[in-house]
Swiss-Prot record:
Record-stated family: Belongs to the DNA glycosylase MPG family.
Domain of life: Bacteria
Any one Gene Ontology molecular-function term assigned to this protein's record: alkylbase DNA N-glycosylase activity
Keyword Calcium tagged: no
InterPro entries: Formyl_transferase-like_C_sf, MPG, MPG_sf
Gene3D superfamilies: Methylpurine-DNA glycosylase (MPG) (3.10.300.10)
The name this protein goes by in its record: Putative 3-methyladenine DNA glycosylase
Annotated keywords: DNA damage, DNA repair, Hydrolase
Pfam families associated with the record: Pur_DNA_glyco (PF02245)
The organism's taxonomic lineage, starting at the top: Bacteria, Bacillati, Bacillota, Clostridia, Thermoanaerobacterales
Biological processes, Gene Ontology terms: base-excision repair
Enzyme Commission numbers on file: 3.2.2.-
First-level EC class: hydrolase
Length: 191
């Protein structure tokens, strides 16, 4: 089942946890590339690590809503990162999808990733955007439309199977427990 807009129109910390075990689906050249979401990070406007912390810009305007859209950005001059916009319109919240477990289209994902091992295919934000061919053309894409790029419902995850910890690769807000991942999943980027 496709996740509806109201799923995303909730607090970023709730959505970040609830996205675990859901499926990110990418339609690519007539094929479906699917990964199970196994790791996320939450960012909100009052968070110093958030792109919207200092207000709205051309780069981050998608974060201000509506919820259920893709926020894709280019970083370090070489990588893309994929986020899901959450919360109320104007609130600037997003969930960074950090890692996926490959489910379908693995041969195509391997080609896009240059033949990496299955464990390394989608186990990081830049790896998953490369493996699913996600770039700036998908920034602002409506994930509730059920075409090109979307998320479908997965099985609920018990609280005891979710690890809550601090985020990776940031300086500001690095002590906030806004990173979530599935316990014992080998596709998580870093434990």
């Amino acid at each position: 089942m496709l996740l509806p807009r109201q799923f995303y129109a909730r607090d970023v910390l709730i959505v970040a946890k609830d996205l675990l075990n859901c499926y990110l689906v990418r339609e690519y050249n007539g094929h479906l590339l699917i990964g199970k979401i196994v790791e996320t990070e939450a960012y909100h406007q009052n968070d110093p690590a958030c792109h919207a912390y200092r207000g709205k810009t051309k780069r981050n305007e998608v974060m201000f809503g509506p919820p259920g859209h893709a926020y894709v950005y280019f970083t370090y001059g070489m990588h893309y990162c994929f986020n899901v916009v959450t919360g109320a319109i104007g609130r600037a919240e997003a969930v960074l999808i950090r890692a996926l477990e490959p489910v379908k289209g693995i041969d195509i994902i391997k080609t896009l990733r240059g033949g990496k091992s299955e464990r390394e295919l989608l186990s990081g934000p830049a790896k998953l955007t490369q493996g699913l061919a996600i770039d700036l053309k998908l920034n602002g894409h409506d994930l509730t439309g059920g075409k090109i790029l979307y998320i479908t419902k997965g099985e609920p995850v018990a609280e005891e199977d979710i690890v809550v910890t601090t985020r990776i690769g940031i300086n500001a807000g690095k002590d906030l427990p806004y990173r979530f991942y599935l316990k014992n999943n080998k596709y998580v980027s870093k434990k």
